[in-house]
Design a protein with these regions (language model features):
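Small-side-chain secondary-structure face that scaffolds active or pore-lining regions
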Residues: 125-147, 177-182, 237-243, 254-329
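Membrane-proximal, glycine/serine-rich, low-complexity loop/turn segments characteristic
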Residues: 1-241, 247-250
Length: 329
C-alpha cells in the first residue's frame, strides 16, 4: 500500500506484523496461456499452385521449365503421397502447443507478541512456453520462467522507547530459452517465413531438410524455423536481487512530547549468471536414388528408382559452451 506524496510521488510501504496469534494465508492460481491469434498459412499445394500462377500471369506462354514447381511436384503436393520428398507441414502445429500453463502461489504469515512482531511472505511463479519438446536433443528447448520472491519484516521493541525494524526481501528469477540460430528474427517471425515444404520435420531423431535442388534452386529454403531451433542449444539465465533495510526509532519524549529520532540504513545487491550452450546437428537431405545415380532419368521412366537415400548437409554436429556472470551492489 502507499500514499500520495508531494509532486505526485507514491510512497510504498510493505506490510508489517501486528501483535496477536499467527495468521496464515495461502493464495494459488493456475492459468492457461495461448496466442491471441494464429495465422492460417497456405499448404504446399496451395503455395505451389499460386506461385506458378504468378509466373503464368506474367508470361502466358510459360513452359514447365519456367515454373518454380514442375507438374510432378504439384501433383505430389496435391495427393500428399510422398511426405518426405514433398512435405506439407503446418509449422505452427508442428512446433507449438496450443496452450501452456502458468501458476502462482503465495504464502503469508503474520503475528507476534507485544515486543516482537513479524510478517513473512513467500511467493512462486511459473510460466511455461509454447514450444514443443524435441526428442533426442538431451535438454529442455522450451521458453520457461521461474520466479521466487521472499519478504520478512521484523519489529523489535528493545525498550519502551526504542524500536528496531528489519526488512529483508528479494527475487530470484530463472529463465530458460532456446538458442535461436538467427540474429535478427524471433521464432515467431521464422515460423511465418517458413515454407510448408522446407522440411518434413524430425524423423527418428534426425533433422530432415528439403534440398533446394529439388526445385532447381528456384526458391530459397534457407530461412526455415526448424533448422534454426532444433539442436541449436539453450540459454539459462539466473538473476538474484536482495534488499535489506534497517530502521532504528528512538522516542525523545523527555525532551518534547512526540519528538523522535530515526536512523535508517539499506543494502542492495544483485547477481546475474547466464549459461549458453550452442549446438549444431547434422541435417539430412532426402533424394530419390535414381536422382543421384542417373539424373537424366525422368520420374515417369520405368527404370527410375524411388527409394529414398539421404545426404548429409553441412558440417558435423558441434557444441560450444559459454558462461557469463555479473554482480552489482
Amino acid at each position: 500500500f502507499g500514499v500520495r506524496g508531494a509532486n505526485g510521488v507514491i510512497l510504498v510501504t510493505t506490510r508489517r506484523g501486528k501483535e496477536g496469534k499467527a495468521k496464515i494465508s495461502v493464495n494459488s492460481s493456475v492459468g492457461i496461456q495461448m496466442p491471441t491469434r494464429m495465422l492460417e498459412m497456405a499448404d504446399s499445394y496451395t503455395y505451389a499452385t499460386l506461385r506458378n500462377e504468378i509466373i503464368t500471369n506474367d508470361k502466358p506462354n510459360a513452359t514447365e521449365n519456367d515454373l518454380v514447381f514442375d507438374n510432378y511436384a504439384v501433383e505430389r503436393f496435391r495427393l500428399n503421397d510422398d511426405p518426405i520428398m514433398y512435405p506439407s507441414i503446418d509449422w505452427r502445429r508442428y512446433l507449438l502447443n496450443k496452450t501452456s500453463v502458468q501458476t502462482q502461489h503465495n504464502l503469508n504469515i503474520s503475528g507476534g507478541t507485544k515486543d516482537i512482531r513479524y510478517f513473512i511472505s513467500l511467493g512462486f511463479l511459473y510460466q511455461n512456453g509454447l514450444l514443443k519438446q524435441f526428442e533426442g536433443v538431451g535438454y529442455d528447448n522450451n521458453y520457461k520462467y521461474k520466479r521466487y520472491n521472499y519478504r520478512a519484516n521484523l519489529d523489535f521493541d528493545a525498550t519502551k522507547t526504542t524500536t528496531l525494524k528489519i526488512g529483508i526481501g528479494g527475487i530470484v528469477g530463472n529463465r530458460n530459452e532456446p538458442m535461436i540460430n538467427d540474429a535478427t528474427n524471433s521464432i515467431w517471425t521464422l515460423i511465418n517465413q517458413t515454407t510448408p515444404f522446407s522440411s518434413p520435420g524430425v524423423i527418428d531423431g534426425k533433422l530432415i531438410v528439403t534440398p533446394e535442388e529439388r526445385f532447381d534452386n528456384k526458391i530459397n529454403l534457407g530461412n526455415s524455423a526448424l533448422p534454426k531451433c532444433y539442436g541449436t542449444g539453450y540459454s539459462t539465465a539466473i538473476n538474484n536481487t536482495m534488499n535489506l533495510d534497517l530502521l532504528l526509532n528512538q522516542k525523545l519524549d523527555f525532551i518534547t512530547k512526540g519528538l523522535s529520532a530515526e536512523i535508517k540504513g539499506a543494502y542492495n545487491t544483485s547477481y546475474g549468471f547466464t549459461k549458453k550452450r550452442k549446438g549444431q546437428v547434422e541435417q539430412f537431405m532426402p533424394f530419390y536414388q535414381s536422382s543421384l545415380e542417373d539424373p537424366s532419368l525422368g520420374y515417369d521412366s520405368p527404370d527410375f528408382n524411388k527409394n529414398i537415400v539421404y545426404k548429409i548437409k553441412g558440417e558435423n554436429k558441434s557444441l560450444q559452451y559459454d558462461e557469463t556472470s555479473s554482480r552489482a551492489r
